[in-house]
From Swiss-Prot:
Keywords: ATP-binding, Cytoplasm, DNA damage, DNA recombination, DNA repair, DNA-binding, Nucleotide-binding, SOS response. GO terms for molecular function: ATP binding; ATP hydrolysis activity; ATP-dependent DNA damage sensor activity; damaged DNA binding; single-stranded DNA binding. It comes from the Bacteria. SUPFAM superfamilies: P-loop containing nucleoside triphosphate hydrolases, RecA protein, C-terminal domain. It holds the Pfam family RecA_C. ATP binds at residues 65-72. GO terms for cellular component: cytosol. It is found in: Cytoplasm. Its main location: cytoplasm. This is Protein RecA.
């Protein structure tokens, strides 16, 4: 094919600089491989399966699942952990279901938690945009996607059919805030629910509310499923929840763990320490007996837990050794 000598080859960079600002482009190798900052969920198990040590900063996270599967507990524990490091948190309580007593039991600092209750989804997204632009909010939690009522639906009467209004709201709102989030130091959690698909005979009969936009924009999607009840005799004292990273753009996805959530107190941190102490060999097991530094400290897991609950000094020793292993592994996650 003959070259057309009349066509002048233009320098693409010079052309961009002439027509647009210098900031309109960059060279690929100028991108810094920055470490992803994260806010701990308060659960070592969940932090581990995210691969980044918790909820990512500057990204959107969706936590979804059926009723009473641990979604709110994970969000509240994350709020508490964020506050522990001096972070500022805003909760958009669209459901109007914030439980002060439960939040307090999970060590949420109510004196520093900002709560707002927008009436519509549009108002909620306007608030999110405004909060991100302040550059002073570390975590925003939206509870929940299902309660983000579109303005059109808010003003309509009960007889009007407004198909797809919720999905359009989510698509427009997320498209608007996504560029702001990426440049911010704010982590955003959307709590979502599952509902049944109509006339589904094959595949998963459940889907999240709000259409497909949140699935697309979320960097991390965490699913919670109630796996079992935790009982003490005949009394039901908690639930065992299966947690799965269904989508993860920051680390390997489809990682799973099981966590214990106790009614009124949330995660069992001590139990998680025991799990990891056994995993890393801090606690050794011979038969039914558990050993620490070659000393018997409990026969069976329940006796072990009782021993550690009564001997705080021993628990601290085991915790410190265990967390050394956990923290070393965390550096490899990121």
């Amino acid at each position: 094919m003959k070259e057309n000598n009349n066509l002048e080859k233009l320098d693409p960079i010079a052309t961009l600089e002439t027509k647009f600002a210098k900031s309109s482009y960059f060279i690929a190798d100028e991108i810094k491989d920055e470490k992803i900052n994260a806010i701990s969920t308060g659960s070592i198990h969940i932090d581990q399966i995210t691969g980044i040590n918790g909820i990512p900063v500057g990204k959107i996270t969706e936590i979804y699942g059926n009723e009473s599967s641990g979604k709110t507990t994970i969000a509240l524990q994350t709020i508490a952990e964020c506050q522990k490091t001096g972070g500022t948190v805003v909760l958009l309580d669209l459901e109007g279901s914030f439980d002060i007593n439960y939040a307090k039991s999970l060590k949420v600092d109510l004196t520093k938690l900002i709560i707002t209750q927008p009436q519509t989804g549009e108002q909620a997204f306007d608030m999110i945009e405004t909060l991100i632009k302040t550059n002073s909010i570390d975590l925003i939690v939206i509870d929940s996607v299902a309660a983000m009522l579109p303005e059109s639906e808010y003003q309509a009467n009960m007889n009007e059919a407004l198909m797809g209004a919720h999905a359009r709201l989510m698509s427009k709102g997320l498209r608007k805030i996504q560029p702001l989030i990426n440049k911010s130091k704010t982590a955003i959690i959307f709590i979502n629910q599952l509902r049944e698909k109509i006339n589904t005979f094959f595949g998963n009969p459940e889907m999240t509310t709000g259409g497909k936009a949140l699935k697309f924009y979320a960097s991390l999607r965490i699913e919670t499923k109630k796996a079992d009840l935790i009982k003490e005799g005949i009394n039901k004292i908690g639930i065992k929840t299966k947690v799965t990273t269904v989508k993860n753009k920051l680390a390997p996805p489809l990682q799973t763990c099981f966590i214990d959530i106790f009614f009124g107190s949330g995660f069992d941190y001590n139990n998680e320490i025991i799990d990891f102490a056994i995993q890393y060999g801090v606690l050794k097991k011979n038969g039914s007996w558990f050993y620490f530094n070659d000393n018997k400290i409990g026969q069976g897991r329940e006796q072990l837990k009782n021993t550690l609950s009564k001997n705080n000094e021993l628990f601290i020793q085991i915790s410190e050794k265990t967390l050394e292993f956990v923290n070393n592994e965390k550096s490899n996650w990121q």
